[in-house]
């Protein structure tokens, strides 16, 4: 299997900071992750994940602020609920809900970001490629 393609929707306040710090600190993680910055994970919509799977992503994760640390107060909790709902949709579509995950981190959690990428990469390697990948 080729290296899995992982899409990460990252909060501008926290997830993006963690991803940026991981890069500037030269931390090692699979290069197959593609990070898309969103103003807040509360802006994340399940259609973003569905489109990513349609375009060939093997997994998608959302990296938001830690609980009670969201700059927009409840954005991370809204994203968490959408991810839970998205998992159900992915199971019903036969793609698999385990291909979608939510992680909470601060902007200083570079290690948490790299762990999330590694966890999702390992998960996809066990599951195999996206079943709807063209």
Curated annotation (Swiss-Prot):
One of its GO terms (molecular function) is 2 iron, 2 sulfur cluster binding. Its cofactor is [2Fe-2S] cluster. It comes from the Archaea. Keywords: 2Fe-2S, Electron transport, Iron, Iron-sulfur, Metal-binding, Oxidoreductase, Selenocysteine, Transport. Binds 1 [2Fe-2S] cluster. Its EC number is 1.12.99.-. InterPro entries: MvhD/FlpD. NCBIfam families: F420_non_VhuD (NF045873). Belongs to the MvhD/VhuD family. This is F420-non-reducing hydrogenase vhu iron-sulfur subunit D. It comes from Methanococcus maripaludis (strain DSM 14266 / JCM 13030 / NBRC 101832 / S2 / LL). The gene is vhuD.
């Amino acid at each position: 299997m080729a290296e899995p393609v992982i899409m990460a929707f990252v909060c501008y306040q926290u997830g993006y900071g963690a991803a940026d710090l991981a890069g500037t600190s030269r931390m090692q993680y699979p290069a197959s992750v593609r990070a898309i910055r969103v103003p807040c994970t509360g802006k994340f919509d399940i259609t973003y994940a569905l489109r990513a799977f349609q375009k060939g992503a093997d997994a998608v994760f959302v990296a938001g602020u830690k609980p009670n640390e969201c700059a927009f107060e409840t954005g991370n909790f809204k994203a968490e609920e959408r991810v839970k709902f998205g998992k159900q949709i992915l199971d019903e579509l036969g793609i698999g809900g385990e291909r979608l995950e939510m992680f909470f981190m601060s902007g200083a959690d570079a290690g948490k970001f790299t762990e999330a990428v590694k966890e999702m990469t390992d998960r996809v390697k066990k599951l195999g490629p996206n079943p709807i990948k063209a």
